Amino acid sequence: MSGTKNSMISDLWYKNAVIYCLSVGTYLDANGDGIGDFQGLIRRLDYLQGLGITAIWLMPFQPSPGRDDGYDVTDYYGVNPRYGTLGDFVEFTHGCQQRGIRVLIDLVVNHTSNEHPWFKQACRDPDSKYRNWYIWSEKRPKNAESGIVFPGVQKSTWDYEKTAGAYYFHRFYDFQPDLNTSNPEVQTEILKIMGFWLQLGVSGFRMDAVPFVISKKGADVTRAQEQYDMLRTFSEFLTWREGQAIILGEANVLPSTDLRYFGDAGERLQMMFNFDVNQHLFLALATSDSRPLKAALEATKPRPATAQWGQFLRNHDELDLGRLTERQRQAVFTAFGPEPEMQLYRRGIRRRLAPMLQGDRRRIELAYSLMMTLPGTPVLRYGDEIAMGDDLKLPERNCARTPMQWSTEPHAGFTKNKKPVLPVIREGPYGFNHVNVAAQRRDPNSLLNWMERIIRMRKEVPEIGWGDFSLIGCNSFQVLIIRYTWRNNSVVFIHNLESEPQEVRFTLRFPNEDKCELVNLLSEDHSFPNETGRHKILLEPYGYRWFRVGRLDHLLRRAPA
């Protein structure tokens, strides 16, 4: 039985992973052309291994005109020559395997580039099989201005194509025509794409825009009609080809819909980003009130045993606040993005975390400690580990996609070319002379070294990824207390969202634990209950604690992970 359990844990590797997202083009340039490449990324694998991450999620690197940072693909079976070759990619995956790091890649199959050969053929020849790979209408549909993803930038979801003599559907930009994913031929092609990259060593895919991928599309479609069984088809294919491979879905949907994406028995998506918790986490940070975050945690608690949430703070897109009420959204705008140039699409904030928190080290640590201890698997963005900033002079979301800052060398050590693919941040407190890996490596008290320690500790607490959680009540709504139990082991995490000290009092109220100590995993600040089993802890402003329930020798007697 023990062997079976450990085999299951190995298969469900994503339960206790730490995922690191990066763009090849902005990580490290090895050949000096100003653009990051796979050879540069290979040179930094030892750095990533030292950081402690266990999986790398690569943003799109396939051939593309680059009008949407690679999310407009022209060839699903290649590597953009700017980044290298398929041989370089295989060398990269082998290097990751040698270091115990898995690779996830973006799977962008809701749409292609309008320069993709499929779309060009569909436009030229109405009898081509590719014509039915896209969505067409002879007349401009009445709902052409509904369902716009990028308000203020995008004006319609239908545009006229002269060569085709018809209107085509595009949920996103007009240069990204939607694939007709209801077409069995398109679904077969998606499986073929996944199989190709699995053969080259990837462990799964971050599927872009999942709700749109599985929706029925067409001029006559007036309401959302999701085809959830499509996800089961994808998942079964992965299981057949590579048993441990996963799909991490981008599905910003209501909590009431989550189980339809996971599947009642976890037979659809293995992982999803928890957008609901993410938005309410920032609301909690903005208002110093844990209650909205608690509500989001409870709302997203139901999920199959094999399913997992991806918990994140910031990603490559804007901080989407679309699930909040107008009043809640304004509270977050006021706290973290008060200027119009900081906001995007009327619903989001286009900033990195550090400048949002005004560079306050205490708040930055609090935020990452929270993310690391929320139910699920933490997903970091490149540069998070050194508190990189943003460049609001760059358009839309590019402001938070600037090159990685490695050193004080010209162009932050990213490239020797005089013209990097995007400008590095030079000025202000987040300029590369102040914020870079080399300087923080030398400083034992730097955020980088703190992040390495917190990642190492997170991997030593599998209860977060595997266990059941419960919220513990206390005397302060500014404080969040969350407890996990797994294999007869328990851990408790406490976070003070307030800028003032908080004396927090609480009782665990679990059988036989009224006298249990709370052993601090990060310092010697242990907590001992009084005669009634009540704990009293003084938290400093934005303070946090990681505790294990049990006596001081309990760490030596834990069940193996």
Model-derived regions, located:
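Active-site and adjacent substrate-binding regions of carbohydrate-active enzymes
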Residues: S2-A561
